[in-house]
């Protein structure tokens, strides 16, 4: 599995808390509801032609599968901690950079692929831009290759 270090899954503390909250909801709400749906469908009699029963059983399978997946992620979670006070780019760093040619400035956080959410300016550590930036320092100029090559200057690295 990607994003593993010695079979650990890299996550931010925030993402781990989101996963734990989702797991709690699935166990305490969704699982209970689907069990009731199955009971209600069974009470309608013949299961061989009972579409409600089939739908509820399929839904139960999806819920149970997601519960197992989340439990595995939690059991293998390793919290990402940025290098506090360092100007070096690492997983967990918030980075501001400037495209040397266009002057365009971007700011994002480098996170694991499980945490990645481009709409929240969180990019995967496996993305080409993150790969180019990891290990670099504030002030460095780095070449990035995404369909075409371009240079960026690291303006700021925040590790908190």
Curated annotation (Swiss-Prot):
Entry-linked SUPFAM superfamilies: FKBP-like, GreA transcript cleavage protein, N-terminal domain
Keywords: Coiled coil, DNA-binding, Transcription, Transcription regulation
GO BP term, pick one: DNA-templated transcription elongation
GO molecular function, one term: RNA polymerase binding
Gene3D superfamilies xref list: Transcription elongation factor, GreA/GreB, C-terminal domain, Transcription elongation factor, GreA/GreB, N-terminal domain
Pfam families assigned to the protein according to its UniProt record, in alphabetical order: GreA_GreB, GreA_GreB_N
Coiled-coil region list: 2-84
Purpose of the protein: Necessary for efficient RNA polymerase transcription elongation past template-encoded arresting sites. The arresting sites in DNA have the property of trapping a certain fraction of elongating RNA polymerases that pass through, resulting in locked ternary complexes. Cleavage of the nascent transcript by cleavage factors such as GreA or GreB allows the resumption of elongation from the new 3'terminus. GreA releases sequences of 2 to 3 nucleotides.
NCBIfam families noted in UniProt: greA (TIGR01462), PRK00226.1-4 (NF001263)
Similarity comment text for this entry: Belongs to the GreA/GreB family.
Entry protein name: Transcription elongation factor GreA
Organism per entry: Mesomycoplasma hyopneumoniae (strain 232)
Gene it is expressed from: greA
């Amino acid at each position: 599995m990607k994003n593993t270090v010695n079979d650990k899954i890299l996550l931010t503390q925030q993402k781990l808390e989101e996963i734990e909250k989702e797991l709690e909801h699935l166990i305490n709400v969704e699982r209970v509801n689907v069990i009731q749906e199955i009971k209600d469908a069974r009470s309608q009699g013949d299961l061989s032609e009972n579409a409600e029963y089939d739908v509820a059983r399929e839904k139960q399978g999806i819920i149970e599968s997601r519960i197992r997946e989340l439990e595995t992620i939690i059991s293998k979670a390793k919290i990402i901690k940025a290098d506090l006070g360092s100007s070096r780019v690492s997983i967990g760093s918030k980075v501001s950079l400037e495209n040397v040619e266009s002057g365009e400035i971007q700011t994002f956080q480098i996170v694991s692929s499980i945490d990645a959410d481009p709409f929240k300016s969180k990019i995967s550590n496996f993305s080409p831009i993150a790969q180019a930036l990891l290990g670099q320092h504030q002030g460095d100029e780095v070449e990035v290759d995404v369909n075409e090559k371009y240079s960026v200057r690291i303006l700021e690295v925040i590790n908190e």
